[in-house]
């Protein structure tokens, strides 16, 4: 047992155990991952992801890390956008490297089909199997709250980015108005676990996912953590009144 603890939903567990517990959750939800995101966001996650891809604006020849990229939902968006830019003005293929801790998620993504620009790697966000100054952009979507040591993952993101590289993190966050916060809390705790039980036959996994959102830092606190990891010009944009937020920073 280690001397440190980590959050697992509303529980505090030994930090050495969290990764295995989270892996177990995603082993169970991998085949229903898109349904899970639809439940967690009311289907709006597709619009949020489109907005992140537009903000990234992938270009030919860029190297992009899609950390916790799981089933490849974001990576496919990036590949298609980079290919369209390539058709307009030429240039080499983009490289999009999905890195995910969970092999079941990666297998689910491969089964759905990929794009020629996409590679798949099983790896830990806290210890990426990639060299220093490797990528032009690092994106993590709905993944960082599941990491045992968020600060370590942020430092790794900074390490693997080239000078001038971009960091983008899409994550569930804190609604900015009290009525919306109360409504989303009611939906999260009363509806999502029950529907998860009906749809995926796994109430506990969905209960964890809801609780993990509530334990995640608010927008400004998380922005400060990104700055502490060495990123500059850190900003955040709220989506759907703060139900989710996109944080951005630069490796300068």
Curated annotation (Swiss-Prot):
| GO BP, one annotated term | aerobic respiration
Keywords for this entry? Menaquinone biosynthesis, Methyltransferase, S-adenosyl-L-methionine, Transferase, Ubiquinone biosynthesis
- What Gene3D superfamilies would the database entry show? Vaccinia Virus protein VP39
At which positions is S-adenosyl-L-methionine bound? Answer: 71, 100, 124-125, 141
Annotated EC: 2.1.1.163, 2.1.1.201
Q: PROSITE patterns from the xrefs?
A: SAM_MT_UBIE, UBIE_1, UBIE_2
Give disulfide pairs as residue numbers: none
What GO molecular function terms would the record report? Answer: 2-methoxy-6-polyprenyl-1,4-benzoquinol methyltransferase activity; demethylmenaquinone methyltransferase activity
Which pathway is it part of?
Answer: Quinol/quinone metabolism; menaquinone biosynthesis; menaquinol from 1,4-dihydroxy-2-naphthoate: step 2/2; Cofactor biosynthesis; ubiquinone biosynthesis
Going by the entry's taxonomy, the superkingdom of the source organism is recorded as Bacteria
Which top EC class is named for this enzyme in its record? Answer: transferase
Q: Family per UniProt? A: Belongs to the class I-like SAM-binding methyltransferase superfamily. MenG/UbiE family.
Give the protein's function. Methyltransferase required for the conversion of demethylmenaquinol (DMKH2) to menaquinol (MKH2) and the conversion of 2-polyprenyl-6-methoxy-1,4-benzoquinol (DDMQH2) to 2-polyprenyl-3-methyl-6-methoxy-1,4-benzoquinol (DMQH2).
The protein's name: Ubiquinone/menaquinone biosynthesis C-methyltransferase UbiE
Give the originating organism.
Caulobacter vibrioides (strain NA1000 / CB15N)
The organism's lineage is: Bacteria, Pseudomonadati, Pseudomonadota, Alphaproteobacteria, Caulobacterales
């Amino acid at each position: 047992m280690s001397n440190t603890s980590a959050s697992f939903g509303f529980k505090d567990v030994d930090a050495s155990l969290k990764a295995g517990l989270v892996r177990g959750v995603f082993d169970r939800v991998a085949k229903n991952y898109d349904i899970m995101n639809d439940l967690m966001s009311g289907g709006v996650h597709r619009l949020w992801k489109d907005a992140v891809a537009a903000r990234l604006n992938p270009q030919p020849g860029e190297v992009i890390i899609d950390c916790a990229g799981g089933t490849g939902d974001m990576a496919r968006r990036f590949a298609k956008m980079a290919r369209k830019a390539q058709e307009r003005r030429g240039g080499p293929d983009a490289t999009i490297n999905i890195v995910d801790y969970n092999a079941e998620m990666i297998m689910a993504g491969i089964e759905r089909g990929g794009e020629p620009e996409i590679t798949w790697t099983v790896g830990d966000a806290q210890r990426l199997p990639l060299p220093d100054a490797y990528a032009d952009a690092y994106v993590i979507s709905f993944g960082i709250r599941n990491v045992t040591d968020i600060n370590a993952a942020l430092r790794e993101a900074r390490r693997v980015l080239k000078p001038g590289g971009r960091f983008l993190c899409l994550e569930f966050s804190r609604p900015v108005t009290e009525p919306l916060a109360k409504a989303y809390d009611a939906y999260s705790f009363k509806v999502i676990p029950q529907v998860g039980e009906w749809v995926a036959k796994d109430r506990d996994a969905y209960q964890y996912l809801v609780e993990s959102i509530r334990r995640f830092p608010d927008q400004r606190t998380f922005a400060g953590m990104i700055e502490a990891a060495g990123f500059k010009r850190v900003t955040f944009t709220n989506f759907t009144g703060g139900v989710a937020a996109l944080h951005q920073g630069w490796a300068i």
